[in-house]
Curated annotation (Swiss-Prot):
GO molecular function: D-mannose binding; metal ion binding
Top-level division of the source organism's lineage: Eukaryota
Assigned keywords, A-Z: Calcium, Glycoprotein, Lectin, Manganese, Mannose-binding, Metal-binding, Signal
Family named by the database record: Belongs to the leguminous lectin family.
Primary gene name: LECA
Protein name: Lectin
Quaternary data: Tetramer of two alpha and two beta chains.
CDD domains reported in the protein's UniProt record: lectin_legume_LecRK_Arcelin_ConA (cd06899)
Binding residues annotated for Ca(2+), in chain numbering: D151, F153, N155, D159
Length: 275
Protein backbone atom coordinates (compact mmCIF):
# COMPACT_ATOMS: atom_id res chain seq x y z
CA UNK A 1 0.00 0.00 0.00
CA UNK A 2 2.80 2.39 0.94
CA UNK A 3 4.49 1.66 -2.36
CA UNK A 4 1.25 2.41 -4.26
CA UNK A 5 0.79 5.67 -2.35
CA UNK A 6 4.36 6.63 -3.13
CA UNK A 7 3.79 5.91 -6.80
CA UNK A 8 0.58 7.96 -6.80
CA UNK A 9 2.32 10.89 -5.10
CA UNK A 10 5.15 10.69 -7.62
CA UNK A 11 2.62 10.55 -10.48
CA UNK A 12 0.76 13.63 -9.24
CA UNK A 13 4.03 15.47 -8.65
CA UNK A 14 5.10 14.75 -12.23
CA UNK A 15 1.62 15.67 -13.53
CA UNK A 16 1.62 18.97 -11.64
CA UNK A 17 5.14 19.71 -12.84
CA UNK A 18 4.15 19.11 -16.47
CA UNK A 19 0.95 21.14 -16.03
CA UNK A 20 2.79 24.11 -14.52
CA UNK A 21 5.46 23.94 -17.21
CA UNK A 22 2.78 23.87 -19.92
CA UNK A 23 0.94 26.82 -18.37
CA UNK A 24 4.15 28.81 -18.10
CA UNK A 25 5.12 27.90 -21.67
CA UNK A 26 1.85 29.16 -23.09
CA UNK A 27 1.88 32.19 -20.83
CA UNK A 28 5.35 33.19 -21.96
CA UNK A 29 4.81 32.33 -25.61
CA UNK A 30 1.30 33.68 -26.10
CA UNK A 31 0.77 36.99 -27.86
CA UNK A 32 -1.92 39.56 -27.19
CA UNK A 33 -2.93 41.47 -30.30
CA UNK A 34 -5.07 44.50 -30.99
CA UNK A 35 -5.96 45.36 -34.57
CA UNK A 36 -8.41 47.62 -36.33
CA UNK A 37 -8.86 49.10 -39.77
CA UNK A 38 -11.01 52.11 -40.65
CA UNK A 39 -10.92 52.63 -44.40
CA UNK A 40 -13.42 55.45 -44.21
CA UNK A 41 -15.33 57.09 -41.39
CA UNK A 42 -19.08 57.36 -40.93
CA UNK A 43 -21.30 59.89 -39.11
CA UNK A 44 -22.18 57.32 -36.43
CA UNK A 45 -18.66 55.91 -35.93
CA UNK A 46 -19.05 53.59 -32.94
CA UNK A 47 -15.43 52.83 -32.07
CA UNK A 48 -14.28 56.39 -31.42
CA UNK A 49 -14.57 58.70 -28.41
CA UNK A 50 -14.85 62.35 -29.40
CA UNK A 51 -13.53 65.20 -27.29
CA UNK A 52 -13.76 68.93 -27.85
CA UNK A 53 -14.66 69.75 -31.46
CA UNK A 54 -13.87 66.34 -32.96
CA UNK A 55 -16.58 64.60 -34.98
CA UNK A 56 -17.08 62.35 -38.00
CA UNK A 57 -19.00 62.98 -41.18
CA UNK A 58 -19.32 60.87 -44.30
CA UNK A 59 -15.88 59.41 -45.07
CA UNK A 60 -13.73 61.57 -42.73
CA UNK A 61 -12.87 62.44 -39.16
CA UNK A 62 -12.75 66.20 -38.58
CA UNK A 63 -10.71 67.35 -35.59
CA UNK A 64 -11.00 71.08 -36.20
CA UNK A 65 -12.70 73.28 -38.72
CA UNK A 66 -10.85 76.26 -40.20
CA UNK A 67 -11.91 78.58 -37.38
CA UNK A 68 -10.03 80.25 -34.54
CA UNK A 69 -9.27 78.80 -31.10
CA UNK A 70 -10.50 75.22 -31.32
CA UNK A 71 -9.39 71.89 -29.85
CA UNK A 72 -10.61 68.59 -31.28
CA UNK A 73 -9.64 65.04 -30.35
CA UNK A 74 -10.72 61.50 -31.19
CA UNK A 75 -9.69 58.36 -29.28
CA UNK A 76 -10.01 54.69 -30.14
CA UNK A 77 -12.75 53.44 -27.83
CA UNK A 78 -10.94 50.40 -26.40
CA UNK A 79 -7.83 50.70 -24.19
CA UNK A 80 -4.60 49.25 -25.60
CA UNK A 81 -2.35 46.96 -23.52
CA UNK A 82 0.97 48.58 -24.43
CA UNK A 83 3.20 46.80 -21.89
CA UNK A 84 2.78 44.03 -19.34
CA UNK A 85 3.59 44.65 -15.69
CA UNK A 86 4.06 40.97 -14.85
CA UNK A 87 6.54 40.12 -17.62
CA UNK A 88 7.94 43.58 -18.34
CA UNK A 89 7.32 43.00 -22.05
CA UNK A 90 6.44 45.93 -24.30
CA UNK A 91 4.26 45.75 -27.40
CA UNK A 92 5.45 46.23 -30.94
CA UNK A 93 2.99 48.35 -32.86
CA UNK A 94 2.42 50.03 -36.19
CA UNK A 95 -0.24 52.56 -37.07
CA UNK A 96 -0.94 54.20 -40.40
CA UNK A 97 -3.30 57.00 -41.34
CA UNK A 98 -4.02 59.54 -44.04
CA UNK A 99 -4.66 63.14 -43.08
CA UNK A 100 -5.24 66.50 -44.74
CA UNK A 101 -4.64 70.02 -43.45
CA UNK A 102 -6.77 72.59 -45.27
CA UNK A 103 -6.01 76.25 -44.58
CA UNK A 104 -7.33 79.41 -46.29
CA UNK A 105 -3.75 79.98 -47.45
CA UNK A 106 -0.38 78.30 -47.01
CA UNK A 107 1.17 81.08 -44.92
CA UNK A 108 -1.18 81.64 -41.99
CA UNK A 109 -1.70 78.12 -40.65
CA UNK A 110 -2.04 76.91 -37.05
CA UNK A 111 -1.52 75.05 -34.94
CA UNK A 112 -1.05 71.44 -35.82
CA UNK A 113 -2.06 67.81 -35.48
CA UNK A 114 -0.86 64.85 -33.39
CA UNK A 115 -1.12 61.10 -32.96
CA UNK A 116 -0.74 60.39 -29.26
CA UNK A 117 -0.56 57.65 -26.62
CA UNK A 118 -1.91 58.65 -23.21
CA UNK A 119 -3.57 57.35 -20.02
CA UNK A 120 -6.98 55.71 -20.39
CA UNK A 121 -8.71 58.66 -18.69
CA UNK A 122 -7.00 61.28 -20.89
CA UNK A 123 -8.80 64.60 -21.39
CA UNK A 124 -8.13 67.54 -23.74
CA UNK A 125 -5.22 69.63 -22.56
CA UNK A 126 -4.18 73.19 -23.42
CA UNK A 127 -5.01 74.37 -26.93
CA UNK A 128 -3.01 76.52 -29.33
CA UNK A 129 0.63 75.52 -29.54
CA UNK A 130 0.20 72.79 -26.93
CA UNK A 131 -1.91 70.90 -29.50
CA UNK A 132 -4.51 69.74 -26.98
CA UNK A 133 -2.12 67.11 -25.58
CA UNK A 134 0.25 68.93 -23.21
CA UNK A 135 0.18 71.82 -20.75
CA UNK A 136 3.86 72.67 -20.52
CA UNK A 137 7.20 72.80 -22.29
CA UNK A 138 8.79 71.37 -19.13
CA UNK A 139 9.18 67.61 -18.80
CA UNK A 140 6.45 66.29 -16.49
CA UNK A 141 6.47 62.55 -15.84
CA UNK A 142 2.89 62.68 -14.50
CA UNK A 143 1.68 63.53 -18.00
CA UNK A 144 2.45 59.94 -19.14
CA UNK A 145 2.03 60.86 -22.79
CA UNK A 146 3.94 60.28 -26.02
CA UNK A 147 2.93 62.13 -29.17
CA UNK A 148 4.00 62.55 -32.77
CA UNK A 149 3.26 66.12 -33.81
CA UNK A 150 2.83 67.72 -37.21
CA UNK A 151 3.43 71.30 -36.15
CA UNK A 152 2.42 74.13 -38.48
CA UNK A 153 3.04 77.17 -36.26
CA UNK A 154 6.30 78.41 -34.72
CA UNK A 155 6.32 78.86 -30.93
CA UNK A 156 9.57 80.49 -29.85
CA UNK A 157 9.41 79.14 -26.29
CA UNK A 158 9.95 75.53 -27.35
CA UNK A 159 10.08 74.99 -31.12
CA UNK A 160 13.34 74.55 -33.11
CA UNK A 161 15.17 77.81 -33.70
CA UNK A 162 15.03 77.41 -37.50
CA UNK A 163 11.32 78.35 -37.26
CA UNK A 164 10.36 75.64 -39.77
CA UNK A 165 7.16 73.68 -39.70
CA UNK A 166 8.19 70.28 -38.44
CA UNK A 167 7.41 66.74 -37.42
CA UNK A 168 8.32 66.07 -33.80
CA UNK A 169 8.43 63.25 -31.25
CA UNK A 170 7.15 64.49 -27.88
CA UNK A 171 7.65 62.74 -24.54
CA UNK A 172 5.82 64.21 -21.53
CA UNK A 173 6.30 67.73 -22.93
CA UNK A 174 5.39 69.82 -25.95
CA UNK A 175 9.13 70.40 -26.41
CA UNK A 176 10.08 67.66 -28.86
CA UNK A 177 12.95 65.26 -28.16
CA UNK A 178 13.64 65.16 -31.90
CA UNK A 179 12.31 67.05 -34.93
CA UNK A 180 12.41 67.03 -38.71
CA UNK A 181 11.65 70.08 -40.84
CA UNK A 182 8.53 69.53 -42.90
CA UNK A 183 6.97 71.41 -45.79
CA UNK A 184 3.20 71.44 -45.42
CA UNK A 185 1.38 70.86 -48.69
CA UNK A 186 -1.89 72.64 -48.07
CA UNK A 187 -4.92 70.54 -49.01
CA UNK A 188 -2.84 67.50 -50.05
CA UNK A 189 -3.32 64.03 -48.57
CA UNK A 190 -0.41 62.89 -46.40
CA UNK A 191 0.21 59.21 -45.63
CA UNK A 192 1.83 58.51 -42.27
CA UNK A 193 3.27 55.32 -40.79
CA UNK A 194 4.37 55.24 -37.15
CA UNK A 195 6.10 52.08 -35.89
CA UNK A 196 7.53 51.08 -32.52
CA UNK A 197 10.15 48.33 -32.15
CA UNK A 198 10.01 46.98 -28.61
CA UNK A 199 13.40 45.27 -28.92
CA UNK A 200 15.20 48.56 -29.58
CA UNK A 201 12.68 51.07 -28.15
CA UNK A 202 12.90 52.97 -31.44
CA UNK A 203 9.87 54.95 -32.54
CA UNK A 204 9.93 55.72 -36.27
CA UNK A 205 7.72 58.14 -38.19
CA UNK A 206 7.43 58.45 -41.95
CA UNK A 207 5.27 60.89 -43.91
CA UNK A 208 4.71 60.88 -47.66
CA UNK A 209 2.66 63.03 -50.02
CA UNK A 210 1.71 60.41 -52.64
CA UNK A 211 -0.08 62.79 -54.99
CA UNK A 212 2.22 65.76 -54.70
CA UNK A 213 2.45 68.13 -57.66
CA UNK A 214 5.52 69.82 -56.19
CA UNK A 215 8.15 67.72 -57.93
CA UNK A 216 10.96 70.10 -57.04
CA UNK A 217 10.30 69.77 -53.31
CA UNK A 218 10.82 66.99 -50.79
CA UNK A 219 7.66 64.90 -50.54
CA UNK A 220 8.71 62.27 -47.97
CA UNK A 221 10.13 62.60 -44.46
CA UNK A 222 11.45 60.16 -41.85
CA UNK A 223 12.15 60.73 -38.16
CA UNK A 224 13.05 58.37 -35.31
CA UNK A 225 14.19 58.38 -31.71
CA UNK A 226 14.52 56.08 -28.71
CA UNK A 227 11.44 56.17 -26.48
CA UNK A 228 11.16 53.84 -23.48
CA UNK A 229 7.39 53.44 -23.49
CA UNK A 230 7.39 51.32 -20.34
CA UNK A 231 9.01 54.18 -18.42
CA UNK A 232 6.67 56.85 -19.79
CA UNK A 233 3.11 55.62 -20.33
CA UNK A 234 0.83 53.41 -18.20
CA UNK A 235 0.40 49.70 -18.83
CA UNK A 236 -2.99 50.37 -20.45
CA UNK A 237 -3.39 53.41 -22.69
CA UNK A 238 -5.62 55.09 -25.19
CA UNK A 239 -4.47 56.12 -28.65
CA UNK A 240 -5.88 58.91 -30.74
CA UNK A 241 -5.55 62.17 -32.61
CA UNK A 242 -5.62 65.78 -31.51
CA UNK A 243 -5.55 69.08 -33.40
CA UNK A 244 -5.80 72.74 -32.45
CA UNK A 245 -6.12 76.20 -33.92
CA UNK A 246 -5.34 79.61 -32.47
CA UNK A 247 -5.40 83.12 -33.87
CA UNK A 248 -4.53 81.41 -37.15
CA UNK A 249 -6.23 78.23 -38.19
CA UNK A 250 -6.82 75.29 -40.53
CA UNK A 251 -9.14 72.34 -40.88
CA UNK A 252 -7.49 69.10 -39.68
CA UNK A 253 -9.02 65.93 -41.13
CA UNK A 254 -8.22 62.19 -40.99
CA UNK A 255 -9.38 60.06 -43.93
CA UNK A 256 -8.36 56.54 -42.81
CA UNK A 257 -6.69 54.82 -39.87
CA UNK A 258 -5.25 51.40 -39.06
CA UNK A 259 -3.50 50.03 -35.99
CA UNK A 260 -1.89 46.72 -35.04
CA UNK A 261 -0.04 45.82 -31.84
CA UNK A 262 1.49 42.60 -30.53
CA UNK A 263 2.39 42.08 -26.88
CA UNK A 264 4.11 38.77 -26.12
CA UNK A 265 3.80 36.85 -22.88
CA UNK A 266 0.11 37.53 -22.27
CA UNK A 267 -2.95 35.37 -22.70
CA UNK A 268 -5.64 37.40 -24.44
CA UNK A 269 -6.23 38.89 -27.85
CA UNK A 270 -8.56 41.42 -29.37
CA UNK A 271 -9.12 42.09 -33.02
CA UNK A 272 -11.49 44.41 -34.82
CA UNK A 273 -12.09 45.43 -38.41
CA UNK A 274 -14.18 48.46 -39.25
CA UNK A 275 -14.98 49.40 -42.83
Amino acid sequence: MASLQTQMISFYAIFLSILLTTILFFKVNSTETTSFLITKFSPDQQNLIFQGDGYTTKEKLTLTKAVKNTVGRALYSSPIHIWDRETGNVANFVTSFTFVINAPNSYNVADGFTFFIAPVDTKPQTGGGYLGVFNSAEYDKTTQTVAVEFDTFYNAAWDPSNRDRHIGIDVNSIKSVNTKSWKLQNGEEANVVIAFNAATNVLTVSLTYPNSLEEENVTSYTLSDVVSLKDVVPEWVRIGFSATTGAEYAAHEVLSWSFHSELSGTSSSKQAADA
